[in-house]
């Protein structure tokens, strides 16, 4: 998942791109859960925090300008698919190398994937 600046009518707006693996044939609910994990992980990974996550009621996050704009402009997301784990890694590396904010989700395999940790 990445936050991606998108040019529209000469005005730059921030959109979030979520990339999912098609080859896993995840149930719809599982896909939604993984996308939600990705959104939250990316937000927390790329915010300025001085928090102990075990004290969730006191969560305090400082947002940079891009994240603030994304939150204030409606949380726009673009969802894409890749055909394989290799394609997911390639997309991740290309986005990271371009300076975009990226996060990878590794599922524990508790409800799907036969107990095997899997990058979704």
Regions found by a protein language model. Give the residues of each.
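Positively charged, small/polar-rich N-terminal and surface patches that mediate targeting and assembly
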Residues: 1-120
């Amino acid at each position: 998942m990445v936050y991606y600046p998108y040019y529209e009518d000469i005005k730059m707006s921030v959109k979030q791109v979520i990339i999912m693996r098609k080859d896993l044939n995840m149930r719809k609910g599982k896909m939604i859960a993984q996308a939600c994990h990705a959104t939250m992980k990316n937000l927390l990974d790329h915010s300025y925090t001085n928090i102990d996550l075990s004290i969730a009621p006191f969560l305090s996050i400082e947002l940079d300008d891009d994240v603030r704009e994304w939150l204030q402009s409606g949380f726009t997301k673009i969802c894409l698919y890749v055909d394989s784990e290799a394609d997911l890694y390639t997309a991740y590396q290309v986005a990271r190398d371009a300076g975009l904010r990226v996060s990878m989700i590794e599922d524990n395999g508790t409800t799907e994937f036969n107990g095997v940790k899997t990058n979704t």
